[in-house]
């Protein structure tokens, strides 16, 4: 027997879900679509490795090792198979590298694998330079990832910036038309600007979900960025480049601001945006005495208009903004009953932030206006 282990289904499924987050789903080289199991270390521990070259995942988990060895199985097929099984003990064994048997109760399946030696040697984790609470990191990533540029040609804007310094820790994303920024109270002894590629964000969120009470340790070397949670390690290829000077576009003196209920504002935008011109997807925001009005109109779809009561006694204000950009922020701040909308003039960027100002971090969002027709 070349390989034989036994593991609880829940333990195995949790590891497979992490590996699936970076696995190539439809195409790619065999190494990108397979997962390596290695039980040669013994002591009831099995190591696991998956990679798509840009991101790599490595972990160890508890299992009964009946025959130490190494096998590589198709990641998605194994994950989907284990997911559908009832909770029980799962046995994985192989008498030859490309024929791996998986048993659970009365279920028995034969998987075709690949040679395990195609997987590179896993690099050891470096000493961390910074630690982040896993729940806070997950919340921060969800509040910034939607502002990452979807255009592959703008490779630096395809990344999220982790800006570490002795006075602040900031996570920033922008696509050139909007910017999301979260600032944490913790600070790093070392000043670093780390670019995290868009494709690594969801695997990193998955890692935070599996971290439990563990903090996420961040380590950096010349080629890769590593995030470690307990026995789990996510390694990301380092992106080189200069992120834009985001501080230059942060509004400073806005002059006027309005507090508005988050859910009523979101409802009004969602109701009216379906009537917006499909080329711009813009809604018009009009603020006047005690009223915030959201409207959209197009010759193709018609017109919609909704009003929200607010407290405002300043000069009237009218501007247009991309409806989806506004909705992204409002959905990400579902725990905040009110948001603060600050503005200067229709040609300047609007600043939005949660109205309560509480929590372990500050969250700012900046949106450029659209041209009014």
Q: Predicted regions span which residues?
A:
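Structural preference for solvent-exposed beta-strand-turn elements
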Residues: 1-373
């Amino acid at each position: 027997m070349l390989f034989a282990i036994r593991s609880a289904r829940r333990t195995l499924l949790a590891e497979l879900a992490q590996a699936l987050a970076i696995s190539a789903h439809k195409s790619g080289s065999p190494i990108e679509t397979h997962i390596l199991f290695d039980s040669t270390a013994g002591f009831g521990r099995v190591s696991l490795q998956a990679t798509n070259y840009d991101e790599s995942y490595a972990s160890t988990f508890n299992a009964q090792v009946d025959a130490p060895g190494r096998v590589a199985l198709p990641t998605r097929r194994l994950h989907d198979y284990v997911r559908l099984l009832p909770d029980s003990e799962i046995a994985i064994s192989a008498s030859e590298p490309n024929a791996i048997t998986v048993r659970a109760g009365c279920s028995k399946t034969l998987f075709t694998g690949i040679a395990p030696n195609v997987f590179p040697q896993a690099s050891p984790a470096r000493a961390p330079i910074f630690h982040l609470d896993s729940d806070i990191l997950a919340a921060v990533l969800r509040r910034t990832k939607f502002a990452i540029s979807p255009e592959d040609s703008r490779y630096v804007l395809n990344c999220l910036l982790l800006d570490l310094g002795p006075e602040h820790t900031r996570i920033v994303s922008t696509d050139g038309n909007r910017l999301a920024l979260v600032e944490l109270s913790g600070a790093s002894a070392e000043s670093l600007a780390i670019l995290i590629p868009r494709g690594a964000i969801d695997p990193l969120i998955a890692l935070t979900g599996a971290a439990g009470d563990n903090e996420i340790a961040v380590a950096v070397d010349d080629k890769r960025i590593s995030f470690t949670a307990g026995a789990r390690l996510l390694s990301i290829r380092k992106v080189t480049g200069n992120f834009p000077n985001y501080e230059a576009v942060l509004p400073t003196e806005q002059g006027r601001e309005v507090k508005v209920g988050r859910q009523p504002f979101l409802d009004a935008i969602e109701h009216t945006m379906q009537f917006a011109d499909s080329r711009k997807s813009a809604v018009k925001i009009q603020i006047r005495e005690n009223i915030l009005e959201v409207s959209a109109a197009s010759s193709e779809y018609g017109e919609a208009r909704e009003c929200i009561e607010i407290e405002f006694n300043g000069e009237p204000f009218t501007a247009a903004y991309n409806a989806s950009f506004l909705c992204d922020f409002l959905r990400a701040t579902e725990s905040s009953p009110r948001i603060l909308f600050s503005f200067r003039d229709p040609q300047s960027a609007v600043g939005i932030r949660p109205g309560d100002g509480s929590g372990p971090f500050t969250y700012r969002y900046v949106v450029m206006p659209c041209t009014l027709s």
